[in-house]
């Protein structure tokens, strides 16, 4: 029912929670953004966040429009940072440089910061793809263009295709008839979220060319079964996934994949090809165990 005498306020209070760390982010936020039009709305929201007062959490008061754009702008900036370091990783591949050392070298600059300078197969999840596209749409509706954000989106799509080529090259130019173990399916660790995960693009591309995929993920396999082709063999652990494999791919950096027994791994594989799309391992350590190693921006 319509109540023309209803007394209310409108406010915007965007969340900045990370999947897998939502409780910690809620309890100890970097800042709280409140977009309000009235003193009453501001007073109410400040009261809601009063428990954070002792932590001296900054509360940023803005207009409603600014608060809404702040959410999109934050995620678009982080997505752009990821796309930037991914493109630098490709350049490092071409020149023989080490992107991990490069990231440390620029990340120690206080103007840049070390966070989100970790190259990989591209960003995914529910936030970055959605929010970058939403920001682009807002710009278009208001007669503006966001060329940097647009380039970040395009670079992210290209990164996934580059990873397919990297895998193919490590297999001698063709994945047809090759068995590939994929460790990690979700877009990031500590979640079962498969939305826009790089695996959703990369695995079908490999299957299309005749690869056999054996996969493992601590939390994402149930969801993966709904989204990925039915020919994938899902396994109980990393070593089962790698049994008879020509290559193993670290797709998602779950902690359990950071401490693999490389000797055991090599003993069950058909070929010892290690493709580290998250740069989890030191290349020399893997090579010492008899593997051919390929990372992203380092080899």
Predicted regions, residues:
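Structural/interface elements that position substrates and couple domains in central-metabolism enzymes
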Residues: 1-299
